[in-house]
A protein has these predicted regions:
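Conserved small-residue
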Residues: 30, 59, 95-98, 134, ...
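S-adenosyl-L-methionine
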Residues: 1-41, 55, 61-87
Length: 353
């Protein structure tokens, strides 16, 4: 297969796509990354829920005419979702959710965060129970298919015990469930980003859950940002600072930690990486100073970040620089979710009478 040039459709192009006849209700929608992926695949998002205010503003800026539920998910009843979605129990085609996952992130201390109130984005709350709130709604709505997304750290270490609880809870309402760790770099995204994807199919449909197959090619960060201006919203590294010195001494594709250790003896800057244009970008996180350009002493610009995150160039980001970076860092890459959605449509939903 010939590798096509890297390109993400514009917001106008996505909104003009014909509806494939299938409806999605989304929870923990964030800025709308997964919702955008479903729209890229031709689905209609008939319900979305997001509790974080800045994420709400970003979602509304991009989908001003779409319904967005802003209450805490714990206050939402299955009947609320079905009423807004215009469906009866058992009619919804796909129920999506990305419960907050920082307690299980491989970049954090997974088990230490269980059962505790912690800061998630702009809110302080318990987040380790939210997956079960998703299951509560799933049980009440009874969609044909569900997709639940989380970090890859959910299936690692002693977090596996929590993973098994989630898997059992997802199967309890009567679903065949499959779980895989998918890497966005094999699904059209120029970024190394592993996510745990649960796909469930209602038992009475008699079909097994499916996941997308890897594409036969990958895109590099250099290909993704080609044609973009070098100037833009970015954090500049000031000459004379430690970070600038480490950046100068670091080769593309390497962490600044080696230079830090050599110059100071300290083991720091482990997640600060100078990107290599011939490779995929490192995982975008909520931190603003982790992905550096290979020739310019700065972070990636927000426009470059959109490209690396699989978002349209004209996708609106609200808030300050840190909040804008966080929105992309927390989002499911739309191009990745589009591949998941297309596979489900072709191999499951089209087979259901």
């Amino acid at each position: 297969m010939t590798k096509p040039p890297y390109r993400v459709p514009s917001m106008a192009e996505i909104k003009a796509l014909p509806w494939n006849g299938y409806r999605v209700a989304s929870t923990f929608s964030g800025c709308g990354g997964s919702c955008l992926g479903y729209r890229m695949a031709g689905f209609r998002v008939v319900y979305a829920n997001e509790f974080i205010e800045e994420a709400q503003r970003t979602y509304k800026a991009n989908h001003p005419n779409s319904f967005l539920e802003t209450r805490d998910i714990r206050q939402v009843k299955p009947e609320d979702v079905m009423e807004k979605a215009g469906v009866e129990r058992g009619e919804l085609d796909l129920f999506d959710g990305s419960p907050p996952c920082s307690a299980f992130s491989t970049a954090g201390k997974r088990e230490a965060g269980w059962g505790k109130v912690k800061t998630y984005s702009d809110k302080s709350q318990r987040v380790d129970d939210l997956f079960f709130e998703y299951v509560r709604l799933l049980d009440g709505i009874r969609p044909k298919v569900f997709v639940a997304e989380n970090v890859s750290g959910l299936v690692k270490g002693t977090a596996k015990g929590y993973f098994k609880r989630i898997l059992a809870a997802l199967r309890e309402p009567g679903y065949r469930v499959s779980c895989r760790v998918l890497d966005a770099q094999w699904l059209g995204v120029p970024q190394m980003r592993q996510r745990t994807i649960f796909v469930g199919v209602r038992d009475d449909l008699g079909l097994d859950p499916v996941h997308p197959s890897p594409l036969p090619y990958r895109y590099t960060v250099g290909e993704a940002v080609e044609g973009l201006p070098a100037k833009g919203d970015a954090k500049q590294l000031k000459p004379g600072t430690d970070t600038h010195r480490y950046w100068v001494a670091t080769k593309p594709g390497c962490s600044l930690s080696d230079a830090c250790k050599e110059l100071t003896g300290k083991n720091s800057f482990l997640t600060h990486v100078k990107q290599a244009p011939h490779r995929q970008a490192n995982t975008i996180t909520q931190g603003t100073q982790q992905l550096y350009h290979w020739t310019e002493p700065r972070t990636l610009t927000l426009q470059e970040l959109r490209r690396v995150g699989g978002f349209p160039d004209d996708f609106a980001l609200t808030g300050n620089f840190t909040q804008k970076w966080e929105r992309i860092g927390r989002a499911v890459p739309p191009l990745m979710m589009a591949q998941v959605a297309k596979t489900i449509e072709e191999q499951i939903l089209r087979c259901v009478a």
